[in-house]
Amino acid sequence: MTIEILRLGHRGERDKRISTHVALTSRALGAKKIIFTEEDKHVKESVERIVDSWGGDFKFEVVKSWRTYTKRFKDNGIVVHLTMYGENINKIMTEIREDISKTNKNLLLIIGAEKVPREAYDLADYNLSVGNQPHSEVAALAIFLDRLTEGKTLYSEYNDAKIKVTPSKSEKCVFVEKD
């Protein structure tokens, strides 16, 4: 299964930091691509710098029509929309994991920056809530991806990484490849 994240409604200066965090969280927790609906050179460059230093094969893409992208993806994939108005993650997560496992389909995860159009709810196979209180889309994304992968991606390492951190009880253990 390949995981892609579709970020709806990035709002330039206002969202560049949170959108960068969405991308970095996606990458760190197992996604292979993030798709934006708005061009933002700053976010793209930040993500590319992280991938260059920390490794992996994470892609950044901008699409003109999120609707077209989602409809095409849905032909051979499962679409999950994270929203505080969806079904309770504790009640539906097992079903989502089983659906992905038995169909061997890829996953598109939709998260919004602003008010999400009604059509996103209709296109999604699952509208999922991570709690029913206001919080960050980064938190919802991290919780969902961790539950989906059952924690298996938390300590991922990449062969092409120039920087690697080794968990330690008492010290900072960082390996930095010299150029």
Swiss-Prot record:
Alphabetical GO biological process terms: tRNA nucleoside ribose methylation
Output a single Gene Ontology CC term carried by this record.
cytoplasm
List positions binding S-adenosyl-L-methionine. Answer: 82, 112-116, 130-137
Q: Which UniProt keywords apply?
A: Cytoplasm, Methyltransferase, S-adenosyl-L-methionine, Transferase, tRNA processing
GO MF: tRNA (cytidine(56)-2'-O)-methyltransferase activity
At the top level, the lineage of the source is Archaea
* SUPFAM superfamilies per record: alpha/beta knot
User: What are its E.C. numbers?
Assistant: 2.1.1.206
Subunit-level organization:
Homodimer.
Q: Which family does it belong to?
A: Belongs to the aTrm56 family.
Q: What does this protein do?
A: Specifically catalyzes the AdoMet-dependent 2'-O-ribose methylation of cytidine at position 56 in tRNAs.
Write down what this protein is called.
tRNA (cytidine(56)-2'-O)-methyltransferase
Q: What species was this sequence derived from?
A: Methanococcus maripaludis (strain C6 / ATCC BAA-1332)
Lineage start: Archaea, Methanobacteriati, Methanobacteriota, Methanomada group, Methanococci
